[in-house]
């Protein structure tokens, strides 16, 4: 299939990578798995046995007229433990490589279909100045954009770092969440070829 390039003639790309059907279920699974993998999972609270103290019972079992109490660290007491305390856990979800690649292909195909993929021959800035990059993006009418190249250019990365709705990634650093999070994805021809290699 043909893919239009902004500043050059159209290029021939793989139908498998850029022309497949959109599998919403698979993309959803990939996005959820990716975001779950980013969770720290280190939350921890103390149960009645974790709270320091409370070894000796506050008063005897019988004869006081008060409700029986075995420890001052009971969850119903002030200063006691938490009833269902949070424990550290691994939130990561298993996603086969084959499924991940299929989800990425599905996202790229949908970006092409909805005219959200802007292909350019090359994209770089001479100096690491935000003003220069902003001027370039304004000329292309891009405000909310992910810039993907085959390798991250240091000047480009530094220039984009302070822009709120602009991100720069290389092909290896692209993920399902970043690809669908922006209005447009600006991608270089070399990055397109790299995606074909990795996902083909």
Swiss-Prot record:
GO molecular function, a single term = structural constituent of ribosome
Q: Which GO terms describe its cellular component?
A: ribonucleoprotein complex; ribosome
Q: Which domain of life is it from?
A: Bacteria
Tell me the keywords, alphabetical order: Ribonucleoprotein, Ribosomal protein, RNA-binding, rRNA-binding
Residue segments, region Disordered:
38-72
Outline what the protein does.
One of the primary rRNA binding proteins, this protein initially binds near the 5'-end of the 23S rRNA. It is important during the early stages of 50S assembly. It makes multiple contacts with different domains of the 23S rRNA in the assembled 50S subunit and ribosome. Forms part of the polypeptide exit tunnel.
Query: Which HAMAP family does the record associate with it?
Result: Ribosomal_uL4_B
Q: How does it assemble?
A: Part of the 50S ribosomal subunit.
Q: What is this protein called?
A: Large ribosomal subunit protein uL4
Source organism of this protein record: Pseudomonas fluorescens (strain ATCC BAA-477 / NRRL B-23932 / Pf-5)
């Amino acid at each position: 299939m043909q893919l239009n390039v902004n500043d050059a003639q159209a290029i021939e790309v793989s139908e498998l990578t850029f022309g497949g059907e959109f599998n919403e279920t698979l993309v959803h699974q990939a996005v959820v798995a990716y975001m779950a993998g980013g969770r720290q999972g280190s939350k921890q609270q103390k149960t009645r046995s974790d709270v320091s103290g409370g070894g000796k019972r506050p008063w005897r079992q019988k004869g006081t007229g008060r409700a029986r109490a075995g420890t001052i660290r009971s969850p119903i007491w002030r200063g006691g433990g938490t009833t269902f305390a949070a424990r550290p856990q691994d939130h990561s979800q298993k996603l086969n490589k084959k499924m991940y690649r299929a989800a990425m292909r599905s996202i790229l195909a949908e970006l092409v279909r909805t005219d959200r993929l802007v292909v350019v021959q090359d994209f770089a800035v001479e100096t690491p100045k935000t003003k220069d990059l902003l001027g370039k993006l304004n000329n292309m009418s891009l405000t909310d954009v992910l810039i993907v190249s085959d390798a991250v250019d240091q000047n480009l990365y530094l220039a984009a770092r302070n822009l709120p709705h602009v991100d720069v990634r290389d092909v290896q650093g692209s993920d399902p969440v970043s690809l669908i999070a922006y209005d447009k994805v600006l991608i270089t021809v070399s990055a397109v070829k790299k995606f074909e290699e990795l996902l083909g």
